[in-house]
Design a protein with these regions (language model features):
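N-terminal secretory signal peptides and thylakoid transit peptides that target proteins
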Residues: 2-19
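Double-stranded beta-helix
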Residues: 32-45, 52-55, 166-189
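Ligand-binding loop in jelly-roll beta-barrel domains
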Residues: 104-105, 115, 140, 147-149, ...
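Conserved short histidine dyad/triad with adjacent acidic residue
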Residues: 108-126, 160-161
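Short, conserved beta-strand element in jelly-roll/cupin
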Residues: 126-140
C-alpha cells in the first residue's frame, strides 16, 4: 500500500514498499475561462561560463486543442542524444510529437475533460515509446481487447500499440507525457 505525504505546496513524497518517488501535488488553479489547469513551465541550463541560467519561467506559450483535449507542449529535442547546454526555448516552437519525420523527444501535458464534455478520441497507434504519469483525475486506457483504469499517481509505458483514452468521470484528467521516437522493428520487417 502506498503512502503519500505533502512535503510542499508543489510536491508530494509517495512511498510504496522500498520504492519512493516525488509526484506533483497539482494545485488545480484554473485558467481565466475556468476550463483548464494553469501550468507553470521553468527551463534552466548553463551559460558559456557554466553558471545556471533560467531560459523560461511562466505559462506554456504553445497550447493547442485537439478533439476537445488541451495539449500544452512544454519542450522538444531533435535527435538523440539531446544537445546541452540549452540555448533557446524549444518549448515555444515544439510541434506535434507524432508528426511524420520527427526524431527526438517531446514533453507535454494533456488535459482530457470528463463526463459530457469528453469527446471521442479515435483508436490510434504511434511509432513512439511514451512514458506517462497521471497527475490528477482518472482515465480509461483502452486497448482493442481490454481496458485499464488509471488514476492520479499511476504511470504507464506505452510501446507503439493501438489504444485510445476515455474519461467517463466528471473530473478532467491531467496526464504528463514524455514521448521518444522509436525504431519500429515490426513496421520495418
Amino acid at each position: 500500500m502506498s503512502r503519500c505525504d505533502k512535503i510542499s505546496r508543489r510536491a508530494m513524497l509517495c512511498s510504496a514498499g522500498a520504492a519512493s518517488f516525488v509526484a506533483p501535488a497539482v494545485a488545480r488553479e484554473r485558467t481565466t475561462d475556468g476550463r483548464w489547469t494553469r501550468l507553470r513551465r521553468v527551463v534552466t541550463s548553463e551559460d558559456s561560463n557554466g553558471r545556471p541560467v533560467v531560459i523560461a519561467d511562466g505559462e506554456p506559450g504553445n497550447v493547442v486543442e485537439l478533439n476537445g483535449t488541451r495539449i500544452s507542449r512544454l519542450w522538444e529535442s531533435s535527435g538523440l542524444p539531446a544537445r546541452l547546454p540549452l540555448v533557446t526555448d524549444a518549448g515555444v516552437s515544439a510541434g506535434n510529437a507524432y508528426r511524420p519525420g520527427f526524431a527526438g523527444t517531446s514533453f507535454y501535458v494533456a488535459e482530457i475533460p470528463g463526463g459530457k464534455r469528453a469527446p471521442a478520441i479515435p483508436m490510434h497507434r504511434n511509432t513512439t515509446l511514451d512514458y506517462m504519469a497521471i497527475l490528477a483525475g482518472k482515465i480509461a486506457f483502452v486497448l482493442p481487447d481490454r481496458e485499464i483504469v488509471l488514476q492520479a499517481g499511476d504511470t504507464l509505458v506505452q510501446g507503439g500499440n493501438h489504444h485510445t483514452w476515455v474519461n467517463r468521470w466528471s473530473e478532467t484528467c491531467l496526464l504528463l507525457f514524455v514521448v521518444v521516437t522509436a525504431d519500429d522493428q515490426k513496421s520495418s520487417a
